[in-house]
């Protein structure tokens, strides 16, 4: 029963131990021990293995070891019994100084598994340090004349221990003259001191020795002592006295070294050495005063030895001391007040504070740009500063308060005129001479989008040959924007409109960045002679600004159309016609006529006719007019001539390369009687055809009248709308191309500056209708005014077909065939010209056209040149077979006007088809009348 109880008790004890260990480990895992300082080697500290719950047998296998953050040799663990003991001397004052808490921190490390335990060992203080005075002996000199209760400070003792071991108490050896004044422990300001309780008498006791003892609060108590040696001094009854207690001196700044400031004097009523006075600065004088002033100890003179600067110090207060040579020395005191007088030796200082830079160019006047502060270290008028600005700038200074100015905007800014202002601010003080300083403020003007892109000119004229490849670069527009950065980033676009039935963008495009204009498809001069459109340039600003430029693209003709034969010949480049010719014709009689037209213009539409030679070298009795296409006899027809004459007429233009068409003309030679029979049959057939044509023409006339009326009304309405609209809409814009034409009197310049504006609305521009005011070069100066040509030039629209070719010119009643050969006369508007002076007349079309320079040269010959100041009597219109005569009228009859002259506009395809149908009937009539008809009806 006893054993069971003992077993249960042991089990409970073990369980309690395990619970404690678990609770210990669940805590911080730390052990706390304490040990007094100066403990001997081997002093027991604690059973660390047991307290950590480690078996003694595990210490070595698990590599039990102790590490210390402090000195690691102070404590050690016995691995045999698991006891922590003192290994070496522990000095708390050496380890922790005067700290109230002192501990040694250990880390216990075991392996398998690895565990770390923290152990804190508190080192307790013991009273092992006695109080210590700074010296073992202290000497004091006290005048015998000192009053009672005079206090003489003493330096106390110190104890290296802490806590109660460092609490000190003092006691003074017994005497009748002095008592000890000990302040409470919490008062650290008032030192330990001796208090005079009884007057001193040097003749009774010249020297007094006292012992001061300090005792700490430890157990046992430790003490420290100091020997006080008090010497009683004889009395020097009179101290030196200055004339005044305060001297005031004014000293200019920047005076040279050696300048006398003042000479002081002090007197002593004593005699002997007690009356001899020595001067000096007081002991509390600053080192700054000593570096600037020197005191003569004998004479009492104060001189300057350093730099006196008013801005550094406006006044110096110098305490002086005069001592006699008695024992003890008695001092006398006075004060020297040196007032420094300011000199204008400091220039103003400017400080610029940037607030809102850069400044937007649309800023309103009054906006504050920068704050400027000024400061002058001088005083009075020398420190009064005024500021001014660079003249002729849009800024001004506004004084906000003392020594502060605001740089404000005074007028409007324009970055495109001046992008940056270097504002010079000048500050000037009121001294004499005046000092000044400057500061530069760089004001950058920030850009706003206030400038639209601008083209170099409002209109460009571009000449492009037809049949260009798709995507061909035809022109480059460029606009300049005076703004900066994204406000100057220009993009280009087309101003879209309709050109006929199609959009402008189907013809051309413009590159948004480079401004290059490209033709998207081959251009056809016969379809579109002038393409007028606008290109818009817009910048990338917000809001975006833009402008437009007008491009007039003239499509230059190329020889891409062969001559086309007109009825009764078949359409195309070849055809056959039959004619009956009487053998009784006289030489030069016109028997037939080949009609042809070329859809090109200029030289490319100038047609010539050639008769191909007959096979076998037989000379044909017929010839063909070079430019008229008229077939006429060269001699009288003979019986030997073949009854059927087959003539091959080659029609070719003057393009490069030349294109041709061939007409076959079959002539049947008959006698005069047979000719009348054939003619009557032809006339009868023609009359029936004419009757049918008359009926058709009536309907055509009615239809044409109706369409014309509708067209006139439409044009009137359109003209009214266009007059009320802006002139830049559609295709109406002034152009400035210069056309230079060569004539018999030299070069003629046709300026478009006075050209009448031709508006084509939203449809394709009909650029063949152009008006020029002829400008002739000035002749030599003369008193007589040279006669000017009448600018009333009119060319009938009925001759438009003749502007492309030399077809059927006899219909105008102008051309006459001479009996003598191929010489021809080209018609003018007013009358037929006489025989040319020599050779063939100049081509009636714009011969010699240079597509690059647009210089027209008429006539291959060298005609007679007109004299200076004279005007040509005729010239040739490009694309026209006519020579225009200029009527010389008196000066008072001149009318300042310009009319339209057509430049080779082709007939529309539908009109040509109708004309071909009408020409078939007309040719039938001509076959019967060819023997007698020498001119066009």
UniProtKB/Swiss-Prot annotation:
This is Protocadherin alpha-7. Residues 774-881 are annotated as: 5 X 4 AA repeats of P-X-X-P. Changing residue 138 to Q: Changed homophilic interaction, being unable to interact with the wild-type protein but able to bind itself. Forms homodimers in trans (molecules expressed by two different cells). Forms promiscuous heterodimers in cis (at the plasma membrane of the same cell) with other protocadherins. Glycans are attached at residues 223, 225, 257, 265, 438, 478, 548. The gene is Pcdha7. Residues 775-787 have a biased composition (Polar residues). One of its GO terms (molecular function) is identical protein binding. The chain crosses the membrane at residues 698-718. The lineage of its organism: Eukaryota, Metazoa, Chordata, Craniata, Vertebrata.
């Amino acid at each position: 029963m006893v054993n069971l109880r003992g077993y249960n008790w042991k089990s409970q004890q073990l369980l309690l131990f395990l619970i404690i260990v678990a609770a210990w480990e669940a805590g911080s895992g730390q052990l706390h021990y304490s040990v007094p300082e100066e403990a001997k080697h081997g002093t027991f500290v604690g059973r660390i293995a047991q307290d950590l719950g480690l078996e003694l047998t595990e210490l070595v296998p698990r590599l039990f070891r102790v590490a210390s953050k402090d000195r690691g040799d102070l404590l050690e663990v016995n691995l045999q019994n698991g006891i922590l003991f003192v290994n070496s001397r522990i000095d708390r004052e050496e380890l922790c100084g005067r700290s109230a808490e002192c501990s040694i921190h250990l880390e216990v490390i075991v392996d398998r598994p690895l565990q770390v335990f923290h152990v804190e060992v508190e080192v307790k203080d013991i009273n092992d340090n006695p109080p210590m005075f700074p010296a073992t002996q202290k000497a004091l000199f006290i005048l015998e004349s000192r009053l009672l209760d005079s206090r003489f400070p003493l330096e106390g003792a110190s104890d290296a221990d802490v806590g109660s071991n460092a609490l000190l108490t003092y006691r003074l050896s017994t005497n009748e003259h002095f008592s000890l004044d000990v302040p409470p422990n919490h008062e650290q300001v008032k030192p330990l001191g001796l208090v005079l309780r009884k007057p001193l008498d040097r003749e009774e006791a010249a020297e007094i020795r006292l012992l001061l003892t300090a005792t700490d609060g430890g157990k046992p108590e430790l003490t420290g002592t100091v020997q006080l040696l008090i010497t009683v001094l004889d009395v020097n009854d009179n101290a030196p006295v200055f004339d005044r207690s305060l001297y005031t001196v004014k000293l200019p700044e920047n005076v040279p070294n050696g300048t006398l400031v003042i000479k002081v004097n002090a007197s002593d009523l004593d005699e002997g050495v007690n009356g001899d006075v020595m001067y000096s600065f007081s002991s509390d004088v600053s080192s700054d005063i000593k570096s600037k002033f020197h005191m003569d100890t004998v004479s009492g003179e104060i001189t300057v030895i350093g730099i006196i600067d008013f801005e550094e110090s406006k006044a110096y207060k110098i305490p002086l001391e005069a001592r006699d040579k008695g024992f003890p020395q008695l001092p006398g005191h006075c004060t020297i007040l040196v007032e420094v007088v300011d000199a204008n030796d400091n220039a103003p200082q400017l400080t610029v504070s940037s607030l809102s830079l850069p400044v937007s160019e649309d800023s309103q006047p009054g906006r504050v740009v920068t704050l400027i502060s000024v400061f002058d270290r001088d005083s009075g008028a020398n420190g009064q500063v005024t500021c001014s600005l660079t003249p002729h700038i849009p800024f001004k200074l506004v004084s906000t308060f003392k020594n502060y100015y605001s740089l404000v905007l005074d007028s409007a800014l324009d970055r495109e005129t001046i992008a940056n202002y270097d504002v010079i601010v000048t500050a000037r003080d009121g001294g004499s001479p005046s000092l000044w300083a400057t500061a530069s403020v760089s004001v950058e003007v920030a850009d706003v989008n206030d400038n639209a892109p601008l083209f170099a000119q409002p209109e460009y004229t571009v000449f492009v040959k037809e049949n260009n490849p798709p995507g061909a670069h035809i022109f480059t527009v460029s606009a300049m924007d005076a703004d900066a950065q994204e406000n100057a980033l220009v993009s280009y676009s087309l101003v879209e409109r309709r050109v006929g039935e199609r959009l402008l963008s189907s013809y051309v495009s413009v590159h948004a960045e480079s401004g290059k204009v490209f033709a998207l498809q081959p251009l056809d001069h016969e379809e579109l002679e002038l393409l007028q459109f606008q290109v818009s340039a817009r910048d990338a600003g917000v809001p975006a600004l833009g402008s437009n430029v007008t491009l007039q693209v003239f499509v230059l003709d190329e020889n891409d159309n062969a001559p086309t034969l007109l009825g009764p010949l078949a359409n195309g480049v070849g055809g056959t016609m039959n004619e009956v010719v009487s053998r009784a014709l006289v030489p030069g009689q016109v028997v037939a006529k080949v009609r042809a037209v070329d859809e090109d213009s200029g030289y490319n539409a100038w047609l010539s006719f050639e008769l191909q030679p007959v096979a076998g070298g037989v000379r044909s009795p017929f010839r063909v007019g070079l430019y008229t296409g008229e077939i006429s006899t060269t001699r009288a027809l003979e019986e030997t001539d073949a009854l059927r004459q087959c003539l091959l007429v080659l029609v070719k233009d003057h393009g490069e390369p030349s294109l041709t068409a061939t007409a076959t003309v079959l002539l049947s030679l008959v006698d005069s009687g047979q000719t009348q029979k054939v003619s009557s049959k032809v006339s009868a057939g023609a009359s029936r055809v004419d009757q049918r044509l008359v009926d058709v023409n009536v309907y055509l006339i009615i239809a044409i009248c109706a369409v014309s009326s509708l067209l006139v009304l439409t044009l009137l309405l359109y003209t009214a709308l266009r007059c009320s609209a802006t002139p830049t809409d559609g295709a109406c814009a002034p152009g400035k191309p210069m056309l230079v034409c060569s004539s018999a009197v030299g070069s003629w310049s046709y300026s478009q500056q006075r050209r009448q504006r031709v508006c084509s609305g939203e449809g394709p521009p009909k650029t063949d209708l152009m008006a020029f005011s002829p400008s002739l070069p000035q002749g030599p100066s003369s008193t007589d005014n040279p006669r000017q040509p009448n600018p009333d030039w009119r060319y009938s629209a009925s001759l438009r077909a003749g502007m492309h070719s030399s077809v059927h010119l006899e219909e105008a009643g102008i051309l006459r065939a001479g009996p003598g050969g191929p010489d021809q006369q080209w018609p003018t508007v007013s009358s037929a010209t006489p025989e040319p002076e020599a050779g063939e007349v100049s081509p009636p079309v714009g011969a010699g056209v240079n597509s690059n320079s647009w210089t027209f040269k008429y006539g291959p010959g060298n005609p007679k040149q007109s004299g200076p100041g004279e005007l040509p009597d005729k010239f040739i219109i490009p694309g026209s077979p006519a020579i225009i005569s200029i009527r010389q009228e008196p000066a008072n009859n001149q009318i300042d006007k310009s009319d339209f002259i057509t430049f080779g506009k082709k007939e529309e395809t539908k009109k040509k088809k109708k004309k071909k149908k009408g020409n078939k009937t007309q040719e039938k009539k001509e076959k019967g009348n060819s023997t007698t008809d020498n001119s066009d009806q």
